[in-house]
Amino acid sequence: MKDEQLYYFEKSSVFKGMMHFSVPMMIGSLLSVIYGILNIYFIGFLGDSHMISAISLTLPIFAVLMGLGNLFGIGGGTYISRLLGAKDYVKTKFVSSFSIYGGLILGVIVILMTIFATEQIAHLLGARGETLGFTSAYLKVMFLSAPFVILFFILEQFARSIGAPIISMIGMLASVVLNIILDTILIFGFDLNVVGAALGTAISNVVASLFFIIYFLRKSDIITMSLSYVRPTKEILVEIFKVGFPAFLMSILMGVTGLVLNLFLAGYGNFAIASYGISFRLVQFPELIIMGLCEGVVPLIAYNFMSDKARMKNIIKVVIMTIVVIFAVCMVIVFTTGHQLIGIFSNDAAIVGMATFMLKVTMTSLLLNGIGFLFTGMLQATGQGRGATIMAILQGVVIIPVLFVMNGLFGLTGIVWSLLIAETICALAAMLIVYLLRDRLTVDKAELLEG
């Protein structure tokens, strides 16, 4: 392991180390949000709402592919970070090689299971009429690219786990920029509409994966793709999946949650869906900054969990303070200029009014959301698979009964407030789980929670 990487893991100031690992993740997350908006923006130029709906309906499938990548990426990545903290540089090769080829095999399985059933899957996602054909076409390209989508998530996580977050950011940046360029060429130049958008995403993932592969082959003696190291032991399997499975489950349940929420909103018409769509995109900016912050420090927490628990506690304190500052700034902006922000996306008075209300409520949940991200990250980083699994289930499931109750009592307003209620429950549960497991994390965890 290079001295520069060890410096940020062990010797730099807590804030400097946190920024080194988290800023690339935050930038990469924001680029993904921007890309998502631009993707819809480009398709919107074609003037066909069915195409826009098709892309939106495929989001749960993307969540599944991301979850499969996280299974080995987060599971293997956090284990690699813990092995580096324990100075076990040989076992990292076995973990990385097994994770990479395991992810590729999962991708091939996805292709075999789905490629001849895209229309049926599109129908299950809610596609009807003209939207069905566009959704099926988009899904076909998405499924064919599954091995590289999964591989991209694995390799990006591995770059961060070995202390190379800048490389992770470059890979994500290259993917997003190439995606935007290809969208423009394929959608408009070749008139491929949604298929062009899907191909742009697929090709960009292939290129980004190749970038990571070349980097690891040339620069890393920790991550390997050699088949000779694909020898999973019981210990390796347990350590990868006890952290990776909760991350996988979280992605799956987030996709299910989004699908259920859309079904509830659909009962109030397009105005409700459009209003939530706008507010959701705006909330995503600070939310993904915080998510990037929390995900970025996972390797730092994992490393110091093995070597310096006092430093780990300080890292967690600094992250919490940073989340509070981000939350405060966002609340001031939303409550002073929220109406104007929504107006950028729509001039419909009803949509602007409802979206502004949704924005204020959902932004209020940002602090609790951030705490949930951090404590779940702590559980992942320290190998507490059972606690992380419970959190993953709660974050995906709690919202559903809350939606039923609040919708029945208060209608659309209740649906909006259900988001804040669910985040409150999950944040409290996360703090309780970490408190109960405090002896397995660090003896100072109780003091941290009380403080």
From Swiss-Prot:
Q: Where in the cell is it found?
A: Cell membrane
Q: Its membrane topology, per UniProt?
A: Multi-pass membrane protein
Q: Name one Pfam family in it.
A: MatE
Keyword vocabulary terms for this entry = Antibiotic resistance, Cell membrane, Membrane, Transmembrane, Transmembrane helix, Transport
Q: According to its UniProt record, which protein family does this protein belong to? A: Belongs to the multi antimicrobial extrusion (MATE) (TC 2.A.66.1) family. MepA subfamily.
Q: Which residue windows are transmembrane per the record?
A: 26-46, 54-74, 98-118, 134-154, 162-182, 194-214, 245-265, 282-302, 315-335, 355-375, 397-417, 418-438
User: Is the keyword Ribosomal protein in the record?
Assistant: no
The domain of life is Bacteria
In which organism is this protein found? Staphylococcus saprophyticus subsp. saprophyticus (strain ATCC 15305 / DSM 20229 / NCIMB 8711 / NCTC 7292 / S-41)
Question: Which Cys pairs does UniProt list as disulfide-bonded?
Answer: none
Q: Report the main location listed first in the record.
A: membrane
The record's listing under CDD domains reads:
MATE_MepA_like
Q: Which GO terms describe its molecular function?
A: antiporter activity; xenobiotic transmembrane transporter activity
Official protein name in the record: Multidrug export protein MepA
The record's section on PANTHER family has: MULTIDRUG EXPORT PROTEIN MEPA (PTHR43823:SF3), SPORULATION PROTEIN YKVU (PTHR43823)
InterPro entries reported in the protein's UniProt record: MATE_fam (IPR002528), MATE_MepA-like (IPR045070), MATE_MepA_subfamily (IPR051327), MdtK-like (IPR048279)
Q: Which GO terms describe its cellular component?
A: plasma membrane
Described function: Multidrug resistance efflux protein.
Sorted alphabetically, the Gene Ontology BP terms of this entry are: response to antibiotic
